Amino acid sequence: MAKVMIVGAGGVGSVVAHKCAALEDFTDILLASRTVAKCDQIAAHIGSPKVKTAALDAFQVSDTVKLLQDFGADLLINVALPYQDLVLMDACLEAGVDYLDTANYEPPDVAKFEYSWQWAYQDKFKDAGLMALLGCGFDPGVTGVFTAYALKHHFDEIHYLDIVDCNAGNHGQAFATNFNPEINIREITQKGRYHEDGVWQEIDPLSVHRDINYPHIGDRPSYLLYHEELESLVKNIPTLKRARFWMTFSEAYINHLRVLEAVGMTRIDEVEYQGQKIVPLQFLKAVLPEPASLAENYSGQTSIGCYIKGVKDGQAKTYYIYNNCDHAVCFAEVGSQAISYTTGVPAALGGLMMVQGKWKQAGVFNVEEMDPDPFLAKLGEMGLPWHEVVNGPFPFDD
């Protein structure tokens, strides 16, 4: 039995709260955000006496520590902004609480995300006897668990990994992002990167693409970009010769993005407007649709998986493991779209693994360092069934 504090009341925070409320292991849930009205709305939708709400500015470490201590939290699940990862980790250390997040740290003034800042907390968490589990959404998150499962059950060595992420849904908007617009646009407008033969290769943003066939969806144009799980996977699976990440974008989305970039609306530095300092990308976020608002009219599916190639018993082997998720089904269950759902469910499940002691070690860890079996045994029951194709077509032999 455990108490969990969830920080963040966006689309993902809502899913995490719904899923935690449905789990017997979580006896008390505190949903905290700068805008407490959002927390109250989510709590009302869940309708469980287990869920309480609170206002919190997560940048204020002392406020977070007090809230954690007053609540008696065993675990903090961070689904707020990546800018807040380090201050929330600091608060957990001070309050003596385990930590879980879904995205690695990113400094507000530089569009650059990497694990080094959080990995540097290893000794602090280990010495405190606390655990910090990093990147426990879907990608990063389930993709790392998928890869660990493949290594445990199907391969002696993994040589090639291509993570593929398709959203074939339709939300009816001319242009909108499926999660925080500021974070989303920063991610895809920076240089693409992939790891090959021990070296990081860099490409211009969205300059490499190919059609990839996704189950029950078909061919979709997929763009090579940098995604954070590549950094931890090449560290934790040193036999990898190449690791890449692909994501689908429609032509209309790319065109909108390029126009916004060309006119300066994706800038993250301050500009002066009518005597005030504003950041263009933050202003753009304010005028774009709130991602959670897309859920009601969303149709279609997502498909996220890992194409893996390596060696088992001296023989070459290919393996594909994936999940498809339906936007409308997610909305019917918890009132969210599938992007939020596929991130929030693994976060709640990762928290469950921690409080049950199945994933429990002192220090800072990525999900692929944990035993994948208990997590994947529960993932389908939690709403994200997964599928395998052994020695099927491998579309990346080029």
UniProtKB/Swiss-Prot annotation:
Free-text function comment from the UniProt entry: Dehydrogenase involved in the biosynthesis of spermidine via the carboxyaminopropylagmatine (CAPA) pathway. Catalyzes the reductive condensation of agmatine and L-aspartate-beta-semialdehyde (ASA) into CAPA. Shows activity toward putrescine and 1,3-diaminopropane, but the catalytic efficiency is three to four orders of magnitude lower than that for agmatine. Cannot use cadaverine or spermidine.
Enzyme class label: oxidoreductase
Protein's UniProt name: Carboxyaminopropylagmatine dehydrogenase
Disruption phenotype: Deletion of the gene leads to substantial accumulation of agmatine and lack of CAPA, aminopropylagmatine (APA) and spermidine. However, the knockout mutant shows a remarkable decrease in putrescine concentration compared with the wild-type strain.
Catalysed reaction equations from the record: N(1)-[(S)-3-amino-3-carboxypropyl]agmatine + NADP(+) + H2O = L-aspartate 4-semialdehyde + agmatine + NADPH + H(+)
Gene Ontology BP, a term: spermidine biosynthetic process
Keywords from the UniProt entry: NADP, Oxidoreductase, Spermidine biosynthesis
Documented effect of changing D139A: Retains 50% of activity
InterPro entries per the UniProt record, alphabetical: NAD(P)-bd_dom_sf (IPR036291), Sacchrp_dh-like_C (IPR032095), Sacchrp_dh_NADP-bd (IPR005097)
SUPFAM superfamilies referenced in this protein's UniProt entry, alphabetically: NAD(P)-binding Rossmann-fold domains
A molecular function GO annotation: oxidoreductase activity
Signal sequence segment: none
EC number: 1.5.1.55
Entry's family note: Belongs to the saccharopine dehydrogenase family.
Substitution effect: E187A: Strong decrease in activity
Domain of life of the native organism: Bacteria
Organism ancestry: Bacteria, Bacillati, Cyanobacteriota, Cyanophyceae, Synechococcales
